[in-house]
Amino acid sequence: MKKKLYLPAAAFLAMTACTNDLDVEPLDPTVSTANRVYADAANYQKALDKIYSVWALSGQDGAGGSDISDLDAGNTVLFRSWFTLQTQTTDEMKNSWSDPWCLDVNGITWGTTKNAPVEGVYQRCMFIVASVTEYLKTIPNAPEEVDKTRFAAEARFCRALAYYTLLDMFGIPPFITEENYSINPSQLPREELFAWIESELQSIKEVLPAARQGEYGRADQAVVDALLARMYLNAEVYTGTDRYTDCIAACNRVIAGGYSLA
């Protein structure tokens, strides 16, 4: 009986040793790793810029490249796909392009087959969620010259916007943060995800610059209120409780900050 126990024990020890041996940096200096990238303090800004860029760019290699290999670099740019699903499915716009996905969107007839804008919105929003989660796990170790609090708040806004988009378009996406990172993530009920996004936005708002006081194109307090206004406008759909008074208040704060409502 003892002999039978020795072999599993030896196998376990061997597996443990292999696992530790694999936890090393690649020897090839041309291979990018998190430790090598973030050794340069300037790369914290660049990584944040990359997170912002996912909304408007499909990848870093021009028209022929995409961050996600099975997504078309042209048809699945996040803002384009989001606009397509929000507008081409209404009487505001139709697109006569002959691609099958386009005809499906025109007629609101897509099903379980691949559809470029549907996959573009879902996969690229989840790409943002994953990127922000990794960024937030790394930034506490940034050098002192990095504005860690501000950068983290901007990244959290990008993730909140991605989750709002998923909430609105898909209902109950996988829920991943730096606290509950998992290969098999859980899903929050729609009303709980709404509450999480609202809380996240409220907690970062004061860290961000006042309206029109920050760098152009970066998150400020007004964009937080603008996103809250969008959420409150349809809160009854998401949670069963209307928030029209809160929507008006958020819109008034945006206007007071010097912006107009489109």
Question: Residue spans of the language-model regions?
Answer:
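Amphipathic alpha-helical repeat scaffolds of TPR domains
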Residues: 229-231
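Short acidic-aromatic linear motifs embedded in glycine-rich loops, typified by GG[WY][YF]DAGD(H)
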Residues: 19-154, 158-169, 174-192, 261-262
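Structural signature of alpha-solenoid helical repeat junctions
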Residues: 144-151, 158, 193, 213, ...
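Short, charged, amphipathic alpha-helices and their helix-cap/turn boundaries
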Residues: 191-206
